[in-house]
Amino acid sequence: KTGSGKNKSAYSYLESIPEEKAMIQKLYEIFTATRSIKKTADKMNELGYRTKVGSKFNTSTTRLLLKNPVYCTADESAYNYFLEHNGGLCGDISDFDGQHGISAYNKTDQEKFEDVDSTFISPKFVQLMSQKPLSEWIISVGRHEGFISSRQWIDTQNMLDDIAEKYNRPHRKTNALLAGLVYCP
């Protein structure tokens, strides 16, 4: 619903904006070619694209856009992907008709707490947001158009998982007593 205050006056739905659709398709195209979040962000900036708020692309915003299922077309492949990853699916496979996009809910945890330099007169708050595991998401078919084929979106998720696995390896452990403390001249 839209409107202000407690009484909402009308319902609104996601609508396709041609420039945004082209930008998202370009983002996925560049990532598929480069297989690099940083190179994708740099190329998007080089081509003159900006985020919704007018900022330059960075690795964080690029990763968020690539992981967002709202751009994925809701079809049988998407349904099976979320089923395999224990996503909370609403509706059955017949709802995933290949005509609409996916809507995902309950994707983030948000915490708000008082900052250390907050005062009674001038309160300051810090808000932390972290992404929940896919198994806690609620997945449904939206009324909006999907911008990216489910195959391309799933391939992108697999590439992102490979990148995360590559860079999230535990550091080497050594039993040497002075390892990291003593250096050769």
Where is each model-derived feature located?
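Conserved catalytic breakage-reunion loop centered on the nucleophilic residue
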Residues: 1-185
